[in-house]
Amino acid sequence: MISITHDRPLGDINTFRMQVSCCLFIEYDRATDLKDLDFENIPKPVKHIGSGSNLLFTGNFKGTILHSKMDFIEKLSDNLFSVGAGVGFDRFSEFAAREGLWGSENLSLIPGEVGAAAVQNIGAYGVEV
């Protein structure tokens, strides 16, 4: 499902709690939802964000914000999982520990979501994703 909001305040989705807004805010809960969007006719630039832990807005964002609500963890085999981009690292770390998978425990309490791992370094205490 896609949710589209115009002129949405962003204070609740950035860790600095900056009271700014964006022209268009789109949340989705399936990756296939994105192919249904008309990217030619939405305000530019387009930014894809997670929990906003690495964002500092200094003013209103004149473009479109995409935000994943894909919040699932699926066990595919003993050591293979499918994890939604919107799953928080703390939740994933707790899940992995319950499953007996070692190594992700140092990711607990890291602000951010799993989807960020594709584009930035995420780690603490000598453990990196």
Language-model segments: which ranges?
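Anion-binding (especially nucleotide phosphate/pyrophosphate-binding) glycine-rich loop
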Residues: I2-V129
